[in-house]
Curated annotation (Swiss-Prot):
It comes from Methanocaldococcus jannaschii (strain ATCC 43067 / DSM 2661 / JAL-1 / JCM 10045 / NBRC 100440). Keywords: CBS domain, Repeat. It comes from the Archaea. This is Uncharacterized protein MJ1404. The keyword rRNA-binding does not apply. Residues 13-74, 74-133, 139-195, 217-274 form the CBS domain.
Amino acid sequence: MRLMLNEPVKEIMTKDVVTVTPDTPVSKALGIMEENGFHHLIVVDKKDGKEEYYLISMRDLLLASSTDEEVRSLMYKAHCVHEDTPFLDAVCEMLDSGQRAAPIVNNVGKMVGIITDYDIMARAAKSKIMKDTKVTKIMTRNVITINENDSIGKARALMRDNNIGRLVVVDDEGNPVGMVTEVDILKKVFKPKKKMTAGEFKGEKVPRMGQPVRLIMNTPLITVDVDASAADAARVMQEYDIRGVPVVKGKSLRGIVTRLDIIKYIADLKKGAMIEIELHGMLDPEFKDLAERIIATEVKKMVKHAGKIHWIKITIKKERDKGGVPYYRITTYVKTPNKLYVGEGRPKASLPNKLEAEGEDIAYVSEHERWEFIDVLKESLESVLRQLEADYDKYHPKHAGKVVKGQFPEEFNPEEFKKEE
């Protein structure tokens, strides 16, 4: 079982790619999307014996002026990803390009597959990292909602004003009862309305955009519990082919997580921006700034040797000896994809003896306590760093004593480490 999300994207991609050509009518492209549950299609344009790849989205097709229009007027040049690109890098490339899908190409630029946000959800659902990540960590907490009796027009305005593609629909008690998306409005309201010569459907006294949103919302509402993992949320979105899922506790709405949230989180893992550091125990305010700087410095050193760190937990115990003089015991836990490292820091000498020998006053006690804490903290962190360096040299004999910045060399085999299933 791979833990590092570093397999080549060709192992994740969908190999059987459905494509269209630039002269395909919008109506036919929409039919292909609805039949297969696609949100995007690749357009293959052959020029001078070579293929160029473009993308079209369902949203763009639904906004077309005519269903007889050719897709060439709506397609855009696709950013392609090489088949040997590591999965994490491929996710970053997709995110940077603004695409939710990307053609996968070989060494000669020939398309061999496609990766979509659906494929990313499938991989995330199996990821040990994502299983260890609470959905509450990546969800949006301040959810924009709409009452089930509010108009469809209001729902559209809320989406436009907040630059979002979906709204959770709530009842009068504020409990979530459904979901409405921009595509729902386009498919169920906008497109049918465009076919009419008047602004209302025959026999209706209220225009469609003025009707209650409950008429077009998706129900029953699919949710995940507040205790679920990010992997659980990814699995639900993949299984039900939805792009966002509310997070609930009982009947209470606590947040919402989308495919984009998970994609961004995965990209942040690659960029090293998601190392969670937890401090347990009493950290005196006068130590805080210096302690944080020391932790940040040592963590950077750890990342160079570990490649990836899931989380760091530091426990601080402040105790007193028989003479009432405070001292610290600090333990640092560092979780990598393959191992849990533990480092301990303890006072190196008896503080009372030092004070008695020096004969200093209480101000000295306070200052000495500060540096005693810092010394113990550094010893705890450096203990873990020494273990990481030892493992790095053990599995990188060619690079003993050196650091390869960014990631492990190719000869590193994560299977040699003890796995934590």
